Amino acid sequence: MSVVLLSMACSKTGLSGADGGAGTAGGGSAGTGGGSVDARPESGLKLVVEVPATVNRDLDLLFVIDNSASMASLQAKLIASFPTFMNVLRGLPGGLPNLHVAVISSDLGAGAYDSADIPGCRHHGDQGIMQNAPRGKTCSTGSLNGGQHFIVDGDGQRNYAGTLEDTFACIAALGDQGCGFEHQLGSLLRALGADGNGGPPPENYGFNRPDAVLAITILTNEDDCSAPVESTLFDPSSRYVADPLGPVSSFRCNEYGHLCGGQKPPRNADAELSGMCTSVEDGTLLRVADVAKALKALKPGALEDVLLSVIAGPPNPYNVRLTAPVLADDPSLWPSIDHSCTAADSSFADPGIRVKELADAFGGNGVFQSICGSSLEPASQRIAEEIGRRMEPTCLTGISDAQPGTPGFQPDCQVVDHFGSAFSGQSDVPLKTCRETKDVAPCWYTDAPTTDCVSGALKFLRPADRGDLRSTTFTCNP
């Protein structure tokens, strides 16, 4: 976690007055070479958080975009919402982070079978390679063409012409000719070299920086169908409803990827299964738990630096519906899954069981938003705000309001700045609230409370020269 140093123009809420009430770093003694602060152990104070002084400004954004049939209009919605996404990031204290931005498709083909067997499923698909050339529209990516496979913008460097929004629009319009057996999770693992195959594709080298926050966003209107490379799940020789694998359709992914009330979704009957379905973790498809584990392992010791967001169909309602026969030589009714949502523009999505479970596996670092709406701006804004929180101050959690009758949130905390190092000598200096210092730096305050941070995010006023400030600790009454 990191904090952002703000100007003195910010509004401050939820602080105590200068009378030694809540929020005061009182009773401490400042000094050099090992000064100490009274921890008031009798009050039951506990260390809530230690906030590093160094702000992490590196952010790697990876968009996994479904490019199968019916996705073109939804890609257009994502592109239209991208300026909103970027405005949130540009509005962060300190401005736009140092960005890497990449786009991959959901197309890994259909195992050992290619387009001669399954239309649209080229052998191995895009292999998780980050895209650097337009597909679904006429545009220019500037110097990305023939060069790097991801956008770079930060530290005074950029590798594209025009605006970042226009460049993203150029590479994010992937079209809708990709394989209908979507491999969102498999493509994601392949792109980041987390699939156990010896690293990412050469085109992707340099994207995932070790110390950067990694924010992944999956956009899809169907659930994931990622299977092991050796899988026969997509065998096109099974084409009739009565065949072992059933017809060559996306229902195969539901039948072998979901478990509803302990049973597979039925192939031969209508069924209403809302609230009953989960992913199957028997290895037919990549296990969601294994995918989450592999992604978290990319940032060992810093799980908060991986954010996994999904924009997809909600998992419910979940209904199996038999429709008219599709094959001329098979009179059987064709199994399908009803859409779980439909937008006013007739775009739709099916239940995203597996992708929702992946987002859930990241707990507070996971976001799930419905893809069905007149606009994706609300979803993009929510995701960008969650990313921003990881580039901004920490939220105090596990503590109560010391003055619940007063507007805002008044934490009862001792706050201490830690300077120096083991080599140069260390000192601990109490840090007062900005109300106590009348907004004279250095001081601290909490931002306005939100539903996601009831205490209000931690904020600081600092002089331009912070010396050798190492970190700041908050020790608070629970």
What do the predicted segments below correspond to?
Residues 6-9:
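C-terminal motif of bacterial Sec signal peptides marking the signal peptidase cleavage site
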Residues 15-39:
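Short, low-complexity, disordered segments immediately C-terminal to signal peptides
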